[in-house]
Amino acid sequence: MELFLKEKINPSSFRFQAENITNFLERIDEKSFNTVFCFGVLYYMPEPLHLLKLMARAAKETILIDTFTASYSAVQGKDAPKYYPHLTSQILNLPLMISCPTQSKKKDYNLPEAFNRKGRSLSLISLPTKAMLELWFESLGLTWEQLDWSSHIARDCSFHDLLTPEQKITSHWADVYASGIRVSYKLHV
């Protein structure tokens, strides 16, 4: 919100809502917002397609999405070493989704749909490939453009370049986009 105020955007022209996103979007009227932002949320949803449907219903014009992809499963969490030997570019180009366990208690919030395993509270993250995301967009009748981060990308890389703690520490913030670990879209409703 500070950014919007700093940029002198009229407070009556935006609204930030902090609550369960699914419950909120299910009860609002269709086409309630010109633009719906979805940054860092989609992968925490047990059913990401359901959230996409709700956002498409709520938006008049545009949905902006920034999310992790299936490649993220190869670099994040203690199970990552089990995943990355099996993740090839051929697999990551298929329309599929990988679900991985993650701690349900985060720094500032708790994830929904928690379950206990060996005394730890866990949730799942849902990590679709780009192909899966675009299949969903098409099924919802949306047109899209992938946002271009190339002007910020310092080097070509893949998730293989971001496996170790040392690689992550020395990486540039845009490496997650260059590697396909993260992707951004502008969806037209």
Indicate residue ranges for each PLM-predicted region.
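S-adenosyl-L-methionine-dependent methyltransferase catalytic module, highlighting the catalytic core
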Residues: P46-A58, I63-S184, H188
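A conserved beta-strand element that flanks and buttresses the S-adenosyl-L-methionine
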Residues: F37
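A general secondary-structure boundary signal
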Residues: F4-L5, S32, T62, L140
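Class I SAM-dependent methyltransferase SAM/SAH-binding core
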Residues: M1-L25
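Local beta-strand N-terminus motif with an aromatic residue
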Residues: F14, S32-N34, K60
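A short His-aromatic
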Residues: G40-Y44
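Short, well-ordered coil/turn elements that cap or connect secondary structure elements
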Residues: I9-P11, E30, A58, S139
